[in-house]
Amino acid sequence: ACSRAGENCYKSGRCCDGLYCKAYVVTCYKP
């Protein structure tokens, strides 16, 4: 499973395609 935009990515450690996870924000975002 992957995290979508705005979702927490700290636990999963991965975001859906095209999204990135900022370590200090811990949410997926579009570049």
Curated annotation (Swiss-Prot):
Keywords: Disulfide bond, Knottin, Secreted, Toxin
GO molecular function: toxin activity
Tissue/organ expression: Expressed by the venom gland.
Domain of life assignment: Eukaryota
GO CC, alphabetical: extracellular region
Signal peptide residue numbers: none
Keyword Secreted carried by entry: yes
Primary site of residence: secreted
Disulfide bonds: 2-16, 9-21, 15-28
Keyword Chloroplast assigned: no
Localization, UniProt: Secreted
Reported function: Insecticidal toxin that induces reversible paralysis in crickets but not in cockroaches and mice. Molecular target unknown.
Family recorded in the similarity comment: Belongs to the neurotoxin 10 (Hwtx-1) family.
Domain observations: The presence of a 'disulfide through disulfide knot' structurally defines this protein as a knottin.
Protein's name in the database: U1-theraphotoxin-Cv1a
Source taxonomy: Eukaryota, Metazoa, Ecdysozoa, Arthropoda, Chelicerata
